[in-house]
Amino acid sequence: ELGFTRARGPEAATEWYNFEALTTPLDHPAADEQDTLYLEGGGLLRSHTSPVQVRTLQNPQPPIRILAPGWVYRRDTYDATHTPAFLQVEGLVVDEGVSFVDFKATLAEFARRLWGPGTQVRFRPSFFPFTEPSAEVDVKRVITLPDGSTRETDWLEIMGAGMVDPNVLEAAGVDSERYTGFAFGMGPGRIAMLKYGVTDLRTFFENDVRFLNQFTGPSGPVGPASESTGVPSPEARHRGGGELR
């Protein structure tokens, strides 16, 4: 309904697509081997889906309005909020006259469609190498508890976003004097954690059907998802406290 189409790209990338085309120098900490998974013989596993944005900018000329979902890879520990491989969705809008007002209105509409019309949205100044200005997007919403009562959540960060740096447009061959745009990125796993009250990201990877079956309906659980499925928690299992049989 918002006019986006899906775009995909390879999970293996060059340093240019993953970093340099996005105004991230190769001496940036994100490009270090401690954070990025490099391949023998050259190349790397993409650490975000932003290379899809660059490839899209190189091919069809604006207007562009895409969502780029896919797996990304980082040298992260496997814990309650991080995994070394995870899904990411990035969005890109580029056209003549795209402004910061368009940026805020689109992302606010996205949040309200996902969590309901009463969702509050705020934008906090931030920094990303490939957007300027940049912002973190937070939401606050009212949730229904198991006993039927309601309460307002704290502010929760859901994505990073910003206006596309003109240098990114120029690197891909797009006239930055004529076109402007914005980009945003989020992790569906963390979005699901916020939406359904899941506290441990690893639960989604444990293949416990008693947990996963809660999401088989058209819209998932009516209320917070239950992680109390009668099996040891992911934290306990990774401490050697039990295993699924």
Cite the ranges covered by each PLM segment.
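Acidic, Ala/Val/Gly-enriched low-complexity intrinsically disordered segments
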Residues: A225-E227, V231, E235-A236
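Long, low-complexity, intrinsically disordered segments
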Residues: E235-R245
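TRNA-recognition modules of translation machinery and tRNA-sensing kinases, especially anticodon-binding
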Residues: E1-E227, L244-R245
